[in-house]
Amino acid sequence: MTTQAPPSNLLPLNPEQLARLQAATTDFSPTQLAWVSGYFWGMLNQQPGAVVNAPATAVEIPAITLISASQTGNARRVAEALRDDLLAAKLNVNLVNAGDYKFKQIASEKLVVVVASTQGEGEPAEEAVALHKFLFSKKAPKLDGTAFAVFGLGDTSYEFFCQSGKDFDSKLAELGAERLLDRVDADVEYQAAAAEWRARIVDVLKARVPKDTPAQAANSASGAVNEVSTSPYTKEEPLVASLSVNQKITGRDSEKDVRHIEIDLGDSGLRYQPGDALGVWYQNDPALVKELVELLWLKGTEQVNVEGKTLPLSEALQWHFELTVNTANIVENYATLTRSETLLPLVGDKAKLQHYAATTPIVDMVRFSPAQLDAEALIGLLRPLTPRLYSIASSQAEVESEVHITVGAVRFDIEGRARAGGASSFLADRVEEEGEVRVFIEHNDNFRLPANPETPVIMIGPGTGIAPFRAFMQQRAAEEAPGKNWLFFGNPHFTEDFLYQVEWQRYVKEGVLSRIDLAWSRDQKQKIYVQDKLREQGAELWAWINNGAHLYVCGDANRMAKDVEQALLEVIAEFGGMDIETADEFLSELRVERRYQRDVY
């Protein structure tokens, strides 16, 4: 970081002091500079006449370490709100993303608060994987001198609801830490639960920290360390943009319907980086709303209350409630409410409830187990509609005021009736070109190109997991980055499912893409996947890794990401001369060094 100094006659420092200050801070990150700024501010604001010789009193106040383990941004938002609450209470708090936390220092922590989301089949957020592994390893220290609290975020439509939060909570207690507050497990509608928990944990922490000490003011600014987005557009206040291109990029005979979507951001000034995600607010299909209303013998004109507003039922269902994802809780509550002879036997059997919810959309649950509900009872069953996140498939270095995404339209039949995913069918079928789309950027600092343009990059992205790597290549091409780039891509058929084929061929021809390995799972009798290609190219892959390459994986979390990681472990073990356990430690080190990054869902 370089700073243009003002004229020397305006500085309160002499040249020697200025040189020492610049030398001491030249390699500081923005986070560290913010902390130092707050620390000196605190020193300045001690009582008049006080003499500051050394920050000796600062260590008397236990710092609250607030760890954000976020996958889609919700955990980060809760953690940032708690940080602000703690600062307002004049408590010393240090907010850190789990991926940046030096987890071996946990034994020296006095107060730890974890806000943890869950992904996939009960796995921790990507940025928290290394910390999770460390705590569950033999290297984890005893934490007898530590007190902690955990807030978990999850989605009850998944079997392992809030499992990551449960893991952190149980393991910290097992290691000897004192639980300050019972863990809270919050569903997608987490805001009220989070607000209540924040108030409770602030009160608990205030009772643990000595009062009225100068060190509190000196350290309180250390919590204000996260970069704050200056964009006026957020999840709560999205940009109303325009859909300019909706192009099917799979072949006529493909079993998949994948769309290349381009959205015009106009003069909004909305900025993003390769690796970020686009949040899309969608509306439910009016035909689906009509079908559900009629199945329940309702009219759709009934008035219901939504967040303090009175709306017609049909409008509320189209704009405000999730209709395409069923959950075990919804099934259980519907069964109890309607006394359904079909569904009541499932109540109490978690596995059966989960399976039924995963295979039976809400509208078909009502069709198979009909009942008559009033409008408010229906609304009470449903969860609020939430935006969907899509990996961004473009770089503003090339597309400027546009953002591109790659959308796999979810389509299936239930007993001959066509069903579709909420957001994907909205984008693929119901938004006309030049139609309005409400969007926002979800920044993802855990999926970034190397800072050094000479660093080699290995990208593994089957299916729509290819999206962020299109952004990566646009960025590397625009910067004329000399680093080598290697892409692994897979899909069922070469002729029908080679997404962005012409672009990849052009990048190869121009030398931007150094090599590409393709896996077509259905073009031959034996299925071939990207993980098979990784093993096939193991020696070269290991050579790239040894040469400092960064590894990136994007796509399905439940199967692909696990299979790819297993293949990577086998390659590292075989060609690195390690056993699997040592290879796992090696891969964990790559993760800590930000050389192994995943965007999985």
UniProtKB/Swiss-Prot annotation:
GO molecular function, one term: sulfite reductase (NADPH) activity
InterPro entries: CysJ, CysJ-like_FAD-binding, CysJ_Proteobact, FAD-bd_FR_type, Flavdoxin-like, Flavodoxin/NO_synth, Flavoprot_Pyr_Nucl_cyt_Rdtase, Flavoprotein-like_sf
Record flagged with keyword Amino-acid biosynthesis: yes
Gene3D superfamilies reported for this sequence: 3.40.50.360, NADPH-cytochrome p450 Reductase, Chain A, domain 3 (1.20.990.10), Nucleotide-binding domain of ferredoxin-NADP reductase (FNR) module (3.40.50.80), Translation factors (2.40.30.10)
EC number: 1.8.1.2
Entry binding sites for FAD: 324, 358, 388-391, 406-408, 421-424, 601
Catalyzed reaction equations: hydrogen sulfide + 3 NADP(+) + 3 H2O = sulfite + 3 NADPH + 4 H(+)
Family: Belongs to the NADPH-dependent sulphite reductase flavoprotein subunit CysJ family. In the N-terminal section; belongs to the flavodoxin family.
Subunit: Alpha(8)-beta(8). The alpha component is a flavoprotein, the beta component is a hemoprotein.
Protein name: Sulfite reductase [NADPH] flavoprotein alpha-component
Organism lineage: Bacteria, Pseudomonadati, Pseudomonadota, Gammaproteobacteria, Enterobacterales
Protein's gene: cysJ
